[in-house]
């Protein structure tokens, strides 16, 4: 699509140029979504460490059963 060719109302070229530049700026300002407390919604490292912790706790509990 050629940007220099005016559209029906003559403003499409300017609108397209402005839209492209705004789109570039919006892509740079994207931030990861976070929950209400500021932590990421999906903290996979936290899930991993909690799994390891509970795995060790269950292992020790079963190991030391009389």
From Swiss-Prot:
Residues spanning the membrane: 45-65
Domain of life where this protein originates: Eukaryota
Family matches, as Pfam families: ALN
Keywords noted in UniProt: Acetylation, Endoplasmic reticulum, Membrane, Transmembrane, Transmembrane helix
GO cellular component annotations of the record: endoplasmic reticulum membrane
Biased composition annotated in UniProt, kind: Basic and acidic residues: 9-20
Subcellular location: Endoplasmic reticulum membrane
Recorded topology in the membrane: Single-pass membrane protein
N-acetylmethionine found at: 1
InterPro entries given in the database record: ALN
Region (Disordered): 1-38
Quaternary context: Homooligomer. Can also form heterooligomers with other sarcoplasmic/endoplasmic reticulum calcium ATPase (SERCA) regulators ERLN, PLN, SLN and STRIT1/DWORF. Monomer. Interacts as a monomer with ATP2A2/SERCA2; the interaction results in inhibition of ATP2A2 Ca(2+) affinity.
Function field: Inhibits the activity of the calcium ATPases ATP2A2/SERCA2 and ATP2A3/SERCA3 by decreasing their apparent affinity for Ca(2+).
PANTHER family: CHROMOSOME 4 OPEN READING FRAME 3
Protein's UniProt name: Sarcoplasmic/endoplasmic reticulum calcium ATPase regulator ARLN
Gene: ARLN
